[in-house]
Swiss-Prot record:
EC number(s) on file: 3.6.1.73
Positions bound to substrate: T9, S10, N11, P12, I13, K14
GO molecular function list: ITPase activity; metal ion binding; nucleotide binding; ribonucleoside triphosphate phosphatase activity
Subunit structure: Homodimer.
InterPro entries: ITPase-like_fam, Non_canon_purine_NTPase, NTPase/PRRC1, YjjX_NTPase
One Gene Ontology biological process: thiamine metabolic process
Protein's job: Phosphatase that hydrolyzes non-canonical purine nucleotides such as XTP and ITP to their respective diphosphate derivatives. Probably excludes non-canonical purines from DNA/RNA precursor pool, thus preventing their incorporation into DNA/RNA and avoiding chromosomal lesions.
Protein name: Probable inosine/xanthosine triphosphatase
Family of the protein in this entry: Belongs to the YjjX NTPase family.
Species assigned in the record: Aeropyrum pernix (strain ATCC 700893 / DSM 11879 / JCM 9820 / NBRC 100138 / K1)
Catalytic reaction(s) noted: XTP + H2O = XDP + phosphate + H(+); ITP + H2O = IDP + phosphate + H(+)
Top-tier EC class: hydrolase
Cofactor comment text: Binds 1 divalent metal cation per subunit; can use either Mg(2+) or Mn(2+).
Keywords, in A-Z order: Hydrolase, Magnesium, Manganese, Metal-binding, Nucleotide metabolism, Nucleotide-binding
Amino acid sequence: MAVTVAVGTSNPIKYRAVLRAFSRYYDVRVVMVSVDSGVGPQPSGVADVVGGALARAVRAVEKADSYFGVGVEAGPIEFPASGGYVETQVAAIVDRDCRATIGMSPSFEVDRRVLALMLDGVEMEKAVGVERHGGLGESVGFVGVATSGAVTRQDLTEHAVIMALIPRLMGYGSIATVEEIAAQAGASVECRSTRAI
C-alpha cells in the first residue's frame, strides 16, 4: 500500500522533487496541498526559512490527513560567508505524531547587493534581475541560470528532502517534535497529532 505524502505547495518543481526523493525509498502517493507558510514571499534567516518549512509541512499533513507532510522553503540563512549568509533550501518532514526531521540542500553565497534586497523581502529572481527569465521559481531557479543548468532548483529541493529523510530511513531512536525544532530555530510553529485514536 502506498504511503501518502502531502507537499505544502502549489509549485510543480517542489512536487516533482518530493516525488522523486520519496520514490527512492517508499511506494508513495504524493499530493500537492496549497497552504500558507506564515512567512513572506522571500523568507530570510533561520527562523523564517526553517519556520516556514515546518509550517508548510504541518499544515499539509493536517489538511490532507496524510502519513507525512513536507514543507520546503528557500532563502538566505546566517552562515560564515562573504555577506554573512548563504542561499539554501530547507525541507521539513512532519508525521502524524508531529515528529519533524529537517534537511538542507547544497548552499551558495549571494552577492551582497542582492542579499540586502532579499533581507528586505525582495524575492531572489527580482533582486538578481533575472525575472526576465520568467517563472524561475517554477523552473530551473536562479541556481539553474547561475550554473548553466548543472544544478537546478529541483535538484536542490530533492537533495534537501533526501537529507530530511535520513533520520527516518536510519531509524533514529529519537526524533524531535515540531515545537522543539521550531524553538531551536527561533520560530513558533505548533502541531496537533492527526493520528486516529
